[in-house]
Amino acid sequence: MDWWSELIDGAPMRDGKSTPSLKRYYRLLNRKFFNGDLPDNVIVRWDADEPDVACTEKRDKDDTTAYVIGFNRKKNPTKSLLLSAMLHEMLHISLKFKDNHGPAFDKGHRMLVKKGAFRKGAVIPDVTLF
């Protein structure tokens, strides 16, 4: 089975659970680029209702670690786009939504660049994230 088929096969949509393959990438990116500091209870899944590439939402207003990252399958047709979008959404979580796309977000993006997140092969062999 190829990468894309494996990622989509049996993916839950709105059941409150992560898509296992997406969650594995979340954990990998968390370790590699966020020092494992992001919460592990984040739900990471395909979302058929997501109109944008991806979106992160709070799952519980009283739990500062409870987030859902939803990805639109059609707007993430490649590994590069999907994992770039995931890093983007993870950066929002790292900032706890205190800075939408302002100076703190820019600083976080520069940190990802410095750590090599967008170098060819940084996450998947022979793939560059954009």
Question: Model-found features: residue ranges?
Answer:
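Walker B catalytic acidic pair
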Residues: 89
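Active-site-proximal or metal-binding-adjacent scaffold patches in catalytic folds
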Residues: 1-84, 93-130
